[in-house]
Amino acid sequence: MEAKAVLRNTPTSPRKMRLVAGLVRGKQVNQAKAILLNSTKAASKNVMLTLKSAVSNYTLNNPDERVSDQELFVKAIFVDGGMTLKRTLPAPMGRAYRIRKRSNHLTIVVDKVKNPVIN
C-alpha cells in the first residue's frame, strides 16, 4: 500500500525542483536520503522534508507493518507549477519589466519494494 506527501507553494521554480526530483526517482528511500544530504541544490532540503513526511505517512497508514528505509522506494515524484507572483522592475525610459516569482507543488509517493534485497 502506497503513501503520499504533498508540499504546496514552495518558492522555487519548478524547473530547478525537477532537477532534484530526477535524482531520487525510483530509488530506495535510504539511497534517496543519502543523495539529498550530499546534494548542493537548495531544493534538496524541501525534497528531503517531503520524503520524510511520505515515509511517516506510510508508517501511520500501516500500523501493523514495520518497515525500514531499505524496504521502501520512491514510486513516483513529480513537480507541478504553483502560483506565480508577478512583480515589476523599473526599466529605462519610463517602462517596467515584469518579474515572475514562480512556485511549485511537489508530490512524492512511496511504496514497499516487492522483493527487497537486504545486504
Swiss-Prot record:
GO terms for cellular component: cytosolic large ribosomal subunit. This is Large ribosomal subunit protein uL22. Keywords: Ribonucleoprotein, Ribosomal protein, RNA-binding, rRNA-binding. Part of the 50S ribosomal subunit. Belongs to the universal ribosomal protein uL22 family. Transmembrane segments: none annotated. This protein binds specifically to 23S rRNA; its binding is stimulated by other ribosomal proteins, e.g. L4, L17, and L20. It is important during the early stages of 50S assembly. It makes multiple contacts with different domains of the 23S rRNA in the assembled 50S subunit and ribosome. HAMAP family: Ribosomal_uL22_B. GO terms for biological process: translation. GO terms for molecular function: rRNA binding; structural constituent of ribosome. InterPro entries: Ribosomal_uL22, Ribosomal_uL22_bac/chlpt-type, Ribosomal_uL22_bac/org-type, Ribosomal_uL22_sf. Signal peptide: none annotated.
